[in-house]
Amino acid sequence: MAMLLKNKDQMIVSMGPHHPSMHGVLRLIVTLDGENVADCEPVLGYLHRGMEKIAENRTIIQYLPYVTRWDYLATMFTEAITVNAPEKLANIRIPKRASYIRVIMLELSRIASHLLWLGPFMADIGAQTPFFYILREREMIYDLFEAATGMRMMHNYFRIGGVAVDLPYGWIDKCLDFCDYFSPKISEYEKLIVHNPIFLERVKGVGFISREEAINWGLSGPMLRASGVQWDLRKVDHYECYDEVDWQIQWQKEGDSLARYLVRIGEMRESVKILQQALRIIPGGPYENLEARRLHQSQNLEWNDFDYQFMGKKSSPTFKLLKQEHYVRIEAPKGELGIFLIGNDSVFPWRWKIRPPGFINLQILPQLVRGMKLADIMPILGSIDIIMGEIDR
């Protein structure tokens, strides 16, 4: 690849591809003028697996295990959007208990995602200690996931019309205990981090995005709300049962890396509030829509039938996707996660277009780092919160 230098004193540095445990396999081609960043070009595609094309050759249920590999730190959200798309297309109603279970799982996943954003973000700046505290709390969330779904990651828990299984006995009490334990820990993080003068020097006023720029670039999630835009799809689209609990949109008006940090810290507090309310008022009833399952039952099996004897697990509903198109979106930890689904009277989608929040949010990175110091690239990149699995797809 030929690259022309505008100034003979400029230097080109290739940052990355980074290790998957940090910001994913992202490569940055940085043009430096001394220690100042003259230009920056993100290079994508190292984790491209053809997720959209795979979806066109699978039924929705067959495709569910794949979607947890998009954003592998917030897999509940990728599962939710995958089942929401055919639910909206076929107008399938969700039982109230299933909707509450989904909200509980989504908010736990949001906290886990923000925690694993905060740890590497602080490590990028040079603070290693918070990383270990954060992993301690995140481990408790994964224990809750394992008890409810059987898996710590890649849960495969959501189903068309509800969820795979009901919450086990005693799980709600354990989750409430976690909320009581975790809520003061957020204040402990703030005391440890926000009052650190070195941290403030590294993030305050760094990576500024104005309100107009955030809207024009199509940013979403904490990137948008940190620039003074009160936009949260949980309030805007009124999906699941978020209207039945009391919570507030977290936003800041400064638009810098510190504001994006404060928004995510505030969102963890609001997620705990949502969890505590949902766990206390969760209704009884079914955890799945039985009508959705009946769509798949072609015949009543007899006791001695071969198929009946060897059916180890109840079948999941697979039905034809009507010849329609629909866009569905949810508020993921990183922003607006959307699916544009086109049906063609087949069990396979004709088109499955993924709208990943990280891909759109990453586009503003060259503008943010231009004119900054080389050392400012990592705090700015960390404040965006990207996962290459959903960016490259």
From Swiss-Prot:
Signal peptide: none annotated. GO terms for molecular function: NAD binding; oxidoreductase activity, acting on NAD(P)H, quinone or similar compound as acceptor; quinone binding. It is a peripheral membrane protein. One of its GO terms (cellular component) is chloroplast thylakoid membrane. Keywords: Chloroplast, Membrane, NAD, NADP, Plastid, Plastoquinone, Quinone, Thylakoid, Translocase, Transport. It catalyses: a plastoquinone + NADH + (n+1) H(+)(in) = a plastoquinol + NAD(+) + n H(+)(out); a plastoquinone + NADPH + (n+1) H(+)(in) = a plastoquinol + NADP(+) + n H(+)(out). Coiled coil: none annotated. GO terms for biological process: photosynthesis, light reaction. The keyword NADP applies. NDH is composed of at least 16 different subunits, 5 of which are encoded in the nucleus. Belongs to the complex I 49 kDa subunit family. This is NAD(P)H-quinone oxidoreductase subunit H, chloroplastic. It comes from Psilotum nudum (Whisk fern). The lineage of its organism: Eukaryota, Viridiplantae, Streptophyta, Embryophyta, Tracheophyta.
